[in-house]
Design a protein with these regions (language model features):
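Active-site SXXK
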Residues: 5, 16-45, 206
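Short, well-structured active-site flanking segments
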Residues: 32-51, 99, 148-152
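Acidic helix-start/capping segments at beta-turn-to-alpha-helix junctions
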Residues: 41-57, 92-93, 158
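Conserved catalytic neighborhood of penicillin-recognizing serine enzymes
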Residues: 52-88, 124-127
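Mid-domain, small-residue-enriched loop/turn segments at the edges of structured enzyme/sensor domains
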Residues: 86-143
Length: 222
């Protein structure tokens, strides 16, 4: 509960595979770079065919073209586009993103690699996070304690339009899903979701991370 400060967790500090949830700290780091004038949302970025990554998202379906940095961020967030995430990592640098993660005092989160082709099963280096760290990211956005409040709210608003709402939001009635900002993550045996919920009862964060689930249906319904 972001207003009262009450929290409950189970294994909330266990470092686990982040999957697509890693795109949340990547986006925060990008917005911080824009705030610090190290990047500009209107910068044009060309995405070439050999840079495209199979998996979630849509950029890999298009011919080579230019995108603004803002467009890449939005596509990365609302469609969990892997190619967009990799271009942003290239622009910011993995070291800078991890420095921003440390600046937010997130002790169990680390970007270890770019996103990979989802057809590859032998990737043994993973990006890591914890349920507590993901909830803390929402708290930073809500309170304006890393980004300014305007930019924090902008990111919350973008994630409200996130198109993959088939995990935690599956259990919420359709007319309330507009009150949820979320970032999902999944890969073989992993089903993750982190949410910011805002309604008349208050402002809440809710995160579930899972590993070694036998299949995606089991991971979603349990």
């Amino acid at each position: 509960d972001l207003r009262s400060g009450y929290s409950y967790g189970y294994n909330e500090n266990v470092s686990m595979t982040a999957a697509g949830c890693m795109k949340l700290p990547i986006a925060i780091s990008l917005i911080k770079a824009v705030e610090d004038k190290r990047a500009n949302f209107m910068d044009k970025i060309k995405v070439l065919n050999d840079e495209k990554v199979y998996g979630t998202g849509i950029i890999h379906e298009f011919d080579d073209r230019d995108y603004t940095l803002f467009e890449l961020m939005v596509i990365m967030l609302i469609q969990s586009d892997n190619t967009a995430a990799n271009k942003i990592i290239d622009i910011l640098g993995m070291e800078q993103i991890n420095e921003d993660i440390k600046s937010m005092e997130l002790k169990n989160t680390k970007l270890n690699r770019k996103t990979a082709d989802e057809r590859m099963l032998d990737v043994n280096i993973e990006n890591m996070t914890s349920a507590y760290d993901l909830c803390m990211m929402w708290k930073h956005l809500y309170n304006g304690t890393f980004l300014n409040k305007e930019n924090g709210q902008m990111l919350i608003d973008i994630l409200e339009r996130q198109q993959i709402k088939n995990k935690l939001a599956l259990y919420i009635q359709d007319d309330l899903k507009s009150e949820i900002s979320s970032k999902t993550g999944d890969k073989l045996s992993v089903e993750n979701d982190t949410e910011y919920i805002h309604n008349e009862k208050g402002n809440f964060t809710f995160t579930v991370l899972s590993e070694k689930v036998p299949n995606s249906v089991y991971g979603t319904i349990t």
